[in-house]
Design a protein with these regions (language model features):
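Helix-hairpin-helix
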Residues: 33-54, 67
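Homeobox/homeodomain signature
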Residues: 5, 52-53, 101-106
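C-terminal accessory module of base-excision DNA glycosylases/AP lyases that mediates lesion recognition
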Residues: 63-129
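Helix-hairpin-helix/helix-loop-helix acidic hairpins
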Residues: 1-43
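Catalytic Zn2+-binding segment of zinc metalloproteases
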Residues: 54-61
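Residue-level detector of well-ordered alpha-helical segments, enriched
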Residues: 22, 26, 43, 47, ...
Length: 129
């Protein structure tokens, strides 16, 4: 888990193509052990993303089924997660200047809360039609 230790202190902003193989390897190595369901054979890439986010909260984003679908990253495989990282990097870069006072909430966590409110719970309607 040397690779994960190197990602833990990092922020999403410098995410680059050099990071892609590491993220794919971590994603795939976490997915199999986090299987669930009745027979323990159902892969949960939601659980994978949650675990990775807990271990590198400013670098590896959270997702769930509605969020992944909303960002066009379904069926939620490792390469989709990398594409999602790129999307979150771009959004984090746009959002960061709007957050003048640093606090204990990472930009990725703020983006997750936004996406959860809009796409998972549908508490917020964007009206972008």
């Amino acid at each position: 888990m040397k690779a994960l230790a190197a990602l833990r202190p990092r922020d999403i902003q410098p995410f680059s193509t050099d990071d892609e193989p590491t993220v794919i390897q971590l994603f795939e190595s976490f997915t199999a052990p986090l299987r669930g369901g009745r027979n323990g054979t159902q892969e949960s890439t939601v659980a994978t993303a949650k675990a990775l986010h807990l271990l590198a909260p400013a670098f590896l984003p959270l997702w769930d089924n509605p969020i992944a679908r909303a960002y066009g990253q379904f069926p939620m495989l490792a390469h989709n997660y990398v594409a999602f990282c790129w999307q979150m990097r771009k959004m984090a870069g746009a959002l960061r200047p709007c957050l003048p006072n640093p606090d204990d909430c990472t930009v990725l966590k703020r983006l997750d809360e936004f996406s959860y409110a809009v796409y998972t719970q549908q508490w917020v309607q964007l009206g972008l039609a």
